[in-house]
């Protein structure tokens, strides 16, 4: 409460809350205690539904939903909204004194709906996220620390770019830098107000300890970057997958997980693929595999997810649609059949299996060099060597390694 009540401090802040920290509960607690108009923004209808339901579960009825996805545009003391729905009616929210943004790592500080809205309303903003970082191309990064203040002004202070020591074949045009969101320039968020560590949640049993298996055969050094420099080129990836026979390897691994020579079969296997090609091949070659893509109709998707949770479907392959908003604590196996340059995506995908459940033995099976790149999610640590210089470190090849605020080749 002190954050919003401190009128002298105009700096925006974030809460770093890992999966399992009870983010919906925290949003509800903060919004209910403020006793003023609070706008809670979330990026999807699934997260909006969760946050709204949690708030109502405490017997609070001074709230409403403002979202086209729910066919509801009602403004109350506490309003839960999606950013896209309010953009044409920004003036209707001018009387709101506090803004809370869930999944705030998705806020583009340079452009987009969030930046436009925040610039216009000029209110203090509190962000919540489990993954407080954004991937950017090095060539697009400015060399001045420009801070974006609630009053609409810009504040320029110190230089922030780290020294660039190129590897062979790497230039500022194809190098990326993963920046902590309070250290992007320009920026919307300035300070980390509070953090719950993943290690604390693991120790207290709020998260499940996972076992990691590196089954990688692809070689990402052979794969080109796309035009943005922020991810792999899809055609180049497709060629590498074909070269190493990724589809065949995926089918073989899933068969072994379902029918091990020793040990107990996996109860539920969630597979992430880059292309629908691998998911469809898996469905052809392994009995009982269901596939969900962005083109799957909503009712069919809901049916498949319910059948997966009930055990009728043992293997669910998806193409980029279940990284967030899918909670299934019993899930004991995630197969990551694609590489990613995004630490946030790696965290979110591993997070599908990290919720605890009695008797659960969680496995992460990686086919995409992600363990070699980022390490285990349980080793991710928020550090601050100097005031305000936050970064995330992990354990890669047995050694601590900065994963943000360094050049990512």
Regions found by a protein language model. Give the residues of each.
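SF2 helicase catalytic motif II
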Residues: 91-134
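A short beta-strand element within the Helicase C-terminal
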Residues: 96-97, 314-318, 324-340, 345-352, ...
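Conserved interdomain linker/interface between the two RecA-like ATPase lobes of SF2 helicase motors
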Residues: 162, 167-171, 190-270
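Conserved segment of the helicase C-terminal RecA-like domain
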Residues: 352-382
């Amino acid at each position: 409460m002190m954050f919003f009540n401190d009128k002298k401090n105009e700096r925006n802040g974030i809460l770093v809350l890992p999966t399992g920290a009870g983010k919906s509960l925290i949003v509800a607690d903060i919004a209910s205690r403020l006793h003023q108009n609070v706008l809670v923004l979330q990026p999807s209808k699934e997260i909006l539904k969760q946050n709204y339901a949690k708030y109502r579960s405490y017997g609070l009825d001074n709230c409403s939903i403002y979202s086209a996805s729910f066919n509801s545009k009602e403004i109350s003391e506490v309003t839960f909204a999606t950013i896209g729905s309010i953009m044409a009616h920004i003036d209707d929210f001018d009387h709101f004194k506090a803004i809370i943004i869930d999944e705030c790592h998705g806020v583009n500080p340079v452009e987009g709906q969030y930046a436009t809205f925040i610039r216009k309303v000029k209110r203090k903003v509190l962000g919540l996220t489990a993954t407080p970082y954004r991937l950017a191309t090095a060539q697009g990064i400015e060399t001045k620390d420009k801070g974006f203040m609630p009053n609409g002004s810009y504040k320029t202070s110190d230089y922030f770019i780290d020294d660039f020591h190129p590897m062979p074949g790497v230039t500022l045009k194809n190098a990326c830098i993963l920046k902590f969101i309070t250290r992007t320039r320009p920026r919307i968020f300035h300070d980390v107000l509070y953090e719950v560590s993943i290690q604390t949640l693991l120790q207290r049993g709020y998260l499940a300890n996972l076992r990691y298996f590196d089954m990688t055969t692809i070689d990402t050094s052979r794969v080109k970057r796309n035009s943005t420099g922020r991810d792999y080129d899809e055609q180049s990836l497709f060629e590498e997958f074909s070269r190493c026979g990724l589809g065949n390897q995926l089918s073989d691994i899933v068969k072994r997980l379902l029918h091990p020579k020793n040990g107990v079969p996996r109860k539920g296997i969630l597979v992430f693929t880059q292309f629908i090609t691998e998911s469809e091949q898996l469905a052809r070659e392994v009995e009982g595999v269901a596939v969900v893509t962005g083109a799957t109709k909503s009712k069919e998707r809901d049916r498949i997810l319910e059948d997966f949770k009930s055990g009728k479907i043992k293997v669910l392959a998806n193409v980029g649609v279940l990284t967030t908003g899918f909670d299934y604590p019993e899930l004991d196996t995630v197969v990551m059949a694609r590489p990613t340059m995004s630490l946030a995506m790696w965290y979110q995908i591993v997070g599908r299996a990290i919720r605890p459940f009695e008797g659960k033995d969680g496995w992460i099976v990686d086919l995409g060099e992600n363990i070699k790149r980022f390490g285990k999610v349980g080793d991710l640590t928020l550090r601050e060597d100097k005031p305000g210089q936050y970064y995330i470190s992990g354990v890669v090849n047995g050694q601590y390694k900065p994963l943000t605020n360094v050049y990512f080749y």
